[in-house]
Amino acid sequence: LGLNKAHIAVEDNKQEAIAALKKHIDPHSEITVEALPSKYPQGAEKQLIQAITGRQVPSGGLPAAVGCAVFNSGTCKAIHDAVYLGQPLIRRIVTVSGDIVMHPMNLMVPIGTSFNDLLEAVGHSENPYKVLSGGPMMGVAQFDLSVPVTKGTNAVTILGRKNHFAVHTPHCIRCGKCMDVCPMHLMPLMMYQAERSGDVPELQKLGILDCIECGCCAYTCPATIPLVQSFRAGKQRVRNAMPPRKG
């Protein structure tokens, strides 16, 4: 890749982790530990690149376009184990939490472990109303708890009924809050309207493929419009309209 510097990004409220990393890094090396504000979605790769280097990945571009590569810490550990120890990726750490979880914790589990087994390990104070693969903002609801942990499962969120609210898909009131909170500086309300009308050229013009599906727009929407689901559908519309790749 031709990269000569490495930055390890850690949220600034993880002081123990920052101290531990600095203790094991040669101060004369090209590896630095960067303490970044604990705000969401700071961990998205384009946000990390801008926060650490000041470079902005162009719309539709990849980190390589600005001379960067971003790797999750878990991925780096898996690469190390595979290359240096000859160990395949057979386990991963999964954060299990939620409002009805009795003992929230990080668990090192074999890939293939069912979500049911995770629920039994942490305990819950009532029957789960909704189980998400992922966190509360970007997680995807699961309808069958026999689904397994995969290499991409980083969290399981278990919610009770009190955190459920009905989504009636009312009309947008054009308050503009979704645009204020979008970390990619997109126009969610315009994208939502374009998706509902099936206007693929407009979706492309609005840069819907740059949406990182962080959920900030849906979280702040006073009309409780399911914006993220709409944008996922819109992105699929755009991809379906693209010419097939050669080769």
Segment roles from a protein language model:
Residues 1:
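Histidine-anchored nucleotide/phosphate-binding helix
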Residues 4-115, 121-126, 135:
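Hydrophobic alpha-helical positions that pack around
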Residues 9, 95, 106-108, 132, ...:
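Structured core elements
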Residues 112, 117-119, 131, 182, ...:
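Short alpha-helical segments in extracytoplasmic peptidoglycan/chitin-binding modules
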Residues 153-169, 179, 183-247:
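Ferredoxin-type iron-sulfur electron-transfer modules in oxidoreductases and energy-metabolism complexes
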